[in-house]
UniProtKB/Swiss-Prot annotation:
Interacts with the Sec translocase complex via SecD. Specifically interacts with transmembrane segments of nascent integral membrane proteins during membrane integration. This is Membrane protein insertase YidC. GO terms for biological process: protein insertion into membrane; protein transport. Disulfide bonds: none annotated.
C-alpha cells in the first residue's frame, strides 16, 4: 500500500467524518454513546409540571401542578447595577430583576498582554447575552422585570466566599431576598430566594432561570466550532439545539438536568436543583433566543419564611478541572465531535502530561510521540509494505510496458509478482484506517481545549491561533514533500501531478489552522519520516 493511496484514504475518511459530524449536531447523544433521533414538536403555549410532594420545612409548603405564563418580553437593562468582583469573575448585576447583565472572566484577557478581559455576558444591543431569573406569578412576586434594591453598589470577595443580596417588597406584605453565592476558585454562582409571606393568604410561587442571547455565530469554515444551545436530562441524554430550531423544540421535564448557551471555549449553564422535576423549553422572541428552566410550583403558608431550593449558574471557560464536578454531563459542553469516546481520554492524557511538563507545546509533542509509539507496529507494517512496493516499482513498470494493452494479462502478472515476493499491496490499509480516528479525535481535542488559548510556545504566543510567521505550515509542507520522496511515484502521470501538488495545497490550507494543530501534524510527519527512513534502510541493506 503506497503513500498515495493513504492520502486518498485520509481524504475519503475526512469527507465522511465531516458529513457524519454535521448530522450529529441535530441529533441527541445518550450516555452510552448512542445517537437518538430528535423528534420535533411545536412549542406548547403552557407549561405543565407533574410534581411530587415534598416538605421544605415546618411550614406548609407543597409542590403542585402549575400552568405558567413567563414574562417573555426581553428588556434592555437601564436600571442601576451592582458590581461584584471575585478572583475569577467581574459581574454587573442589574437592579432590574437582579439580572447578571455583564460578565468578564478575570483570567482570560481578550488579547495577549491586554488589560481588557474577555466578556462572556453582555447587555450591548448587538451582543445580548444575559442570565435572567425570577419568580412567578407576575404581579405578586418579582420577575426579571421587577426592581430590586441593594445595600451596596460594589462587592469584593476578600475571603473564600461571598453572598450578594437583592431585596424586593410588595405593597401587600411579601418580601423576597434574592441572593447570589460565590466561592473562591469557582465559576459556579449559587442563586436562592428567601421569601417572607406576611399576608393572610397562601402564596403560590414558581422560580425560573432563562438564558438569553442573539445568534452571533463565532465559527468559520476553517475552524468549525459550535455556537448555540444545549440541554441535558436525567436520562443522561445530551442534545444540541441550533438557533434556527429553538421554536421547534418540545417542552421537556427532567429531574435535575441543565440548559446551556455554548460558544467556542466558553459557555453559560443554568443548573437547577438536582432533586426536583423541572420543565425545560426554548423559543425565539424578537430575534433573540431563550432557553428556560422552570422549577416546581410551591404553596407557601401565611406567615411563613421560606428559602427555596437553590439553583446555580456556571459562567466561564470549558476547563475540564472546573466543570467535571459541577453537574452530571456538563463535561459534554466540550465538543469533541462524534469520536468523543476516543477524544476524551486523549484530552485527559494531554492534561496529565501538562501537569508534569508545564508546557502545552511540549505536551502536544509528547502526546504525539506516545501515540506514535502506540501505533509503532501497525505503522511499521504499513511502511514495510511501502518499501516493498518501492523495490518492485521498476519491475511493475516493466510489466506495464510489456502487457499494457492486455489489462487482464497485466493484472495476472502483477498478482503473480506480488505472490512471488510475498507482498500484499493492501496490507498497509488497516494501519492507516486504525490511526485516522485517533488523528480526528486529537484534532477536536486541540481545537476545543481552552487551555491552549493564548498558551505560548517558543516564538508562538498563542497555540490556539494561526502561526503569525507561517513557519510551522511551511515545515509541514516540506515534511509532506519529503515523505512522498520515500515512496515510489504513482505509475499514472496525472496521479503523480496531483500528489506533487498536495504538499502545496495542504500548506496553504494549514496557514489558517491553529498552530497547536499544525505542531501536532509537523511532529507526526517528522516521526513518520524517521520511522519510514529507518525501515527502508533496513530493507535495502
Amino acid at each position: 500500500m503506497n503513500n498515495q493511496k493513504n492520502f486518498l484514504i485520509v481524504a475519503i475518511f475526512l469527507s465522511v467524518f465531516l458529513l457524519w459530524d454535521k448530522w450529529g449536531v441535530t441529533h441527541v447523544v445518550g450516555a452510552n454513546g448512542n445517537l437518538i433521533s430528535q423528534t420535533k414538536i411545536k412549542d406548547a403555549s403552557t407549561i405543565n409540571n407533574s410534581l411530587t410532594n415534598k416538605n421544605l420545612n415546618a411550614s406548609s409548603i407543597i409542590h403542585r401542578n402549575a400552568e405558567l405564563d413567563l414574562p417573555n418580553t426581553i428588556t434592555k437593562n437601564q436600571a442601576p447595577f451592582t458590581t461584584v468582583v471575585t478572583d475569577l469573575l467581574t459581574l454587573e448585576i442589574s437592579h432590574k430583576g437582579g439580572t447578571i447583565q455583564n460578565a468578564w472572566l478575570n483570567d482570560y484577557p481578550i488579547e495577549i498582554n491586554s488589560e481588557q478581559k474577555f466578556q462572556l455576558l453582555s447587555n450591548k444591543a448587538d451582543e445580548i447575552f444575559q442570565a435572567q431569573s425570577g419568580l412567578l406569578p407576575q404581579g405578586q412576586t418579582p420577575t426579571h422585570h421587577s426592581i430590586f434594591s441593594s445595600k451596596n453598589s460594589h462587592y469584593q470577595m476578600d475571603g473564600n466566599s461571598l453572598v450578594v443580596p437583592f431585596t424586593w417588597k410588595s405593597e401587600n406584605g411579601i418580601k423576597v431576598i434574592k441572593r447570589y453565592h460565590f466561592n473562591k476558585n469557582s465559576y459556579v454562582i449559587g442563586i436562592d430566594y428567601q421569601i417572607t409571606n406576611t399576608t393572610n393568604n397562601t402564596l403560590n410561587i414558581t422560580s425560573y432561570t432563562q438564558l438569553v442571547r442573539n445568534a452571533l455565530d463565532q465559527s468559520n469554515m476553517i475552524i468549525p466550532t459550535y455556537t448555540g444551545g444545549a440541554r441535558f436530562d436525567d436520562q443522561d441524554v445530551y442534545e444540541k439545539i441550533e438557533f434556527e430550531d429553538f421554536n421547534d423544540q418540545p417542552k421537556t421535564t427532567s429531574k435535575g438536568g441543565w440548559i446551556a448557551m455554548i460558544e467556542h471555549y466558553f459557555f453559560v449553564a443554568a443548573i437547577p436543583d438536582v432533586n426536583q422535576i423541572h420543565t425545560y423549553s426554548s423559543k425565539i422572541i424578537n430575534g433573540e433566543y431563550l432557553l428556560t428552566v422552570v422549577n416546581p410550583e410551591l404553596v407557601i403558608a401565611p406567615g411563613a419564611i421560606v428559602t427555596l431550593p437553590s439553583s446555580s449558574l456556571y459562567i466561564g471557560p470549558k476547563e475540564q478541572k472546573q466543570i467535571n464536578n459541577v453537574a452530571p454531563g456538563l463535561d459534554k459542553t466540550v465538543d469533541y465531535g462524534v469520536l468523543f469516546i476516543i477524544a476524551k481520554p486523549l484530552s485527559e492524557l494531554l492534561n496529565w502530561i501538562y501537569s508534569i511538563i508545564h508546557s502545552w507545546g511540549y505536551s502536544i509533542i509528547t502526546l504525539t510521540l506516545l501515540i506514535k509509539l502506540a501505533f509503532y507496529k501497525l505503522s511499521e507494517k504499513s511502511y514495510r509494505s511501502m518499501a516493498g512496493m518501492r523495490q518492485l516499482a521498476p519491475r511493475l513498470t516493466k510489466l506495464k510496458e510489456t502487457y499494457g494493452d492486455d489489462k487482464q494479462k497485466l493484472g495476472q502478472k502483477t498478482m503473480e509478482l506480488y505472490k512471488k515476493e510475498k507482498i500484499n499491496p493492501a496490507s498497509g490499509c488497516l494501519p492507516i484506517l486504525v490511526q485516522i480516528p485517533v488523528f480526528i479525535s486529537l484534532y477536536w481535542v486541540l481545537l476545543e481545549m481552552v487551555e491552549l488559548r493564548q498558551a505560548p510556545f517558543w516564538y508562538l504566543t498563542d497555540l490556539s491561533a494561526q502561526d503569525p510567521y507561517y513557519i510551522l505550515p511551511l515545515i509541514m509542507g516540506v515534511s509532506m514533500f519529503a515523505q512522498q520522496k520515500l515512496n515510489p511515484p504513482p505509475p499514472d502521470p496525472m496521479q503523480a501531478k496531483i500528489m506533487m501538488a498536495l504538499p502545496f495545497v495542504f500548506t496553504i490550507f494549514f496557514l489558517w489552522f491553529p498552530s497547536g494543530l499544525v505542531l501536532y501534524w509537523v511532529v507526526n510527519n517528522i516521526l513518520s519520516i524517521t520511522q519510514q527512513w529507518v525501515i527502508n534502510k533496513r530493507i535495502n541493506g
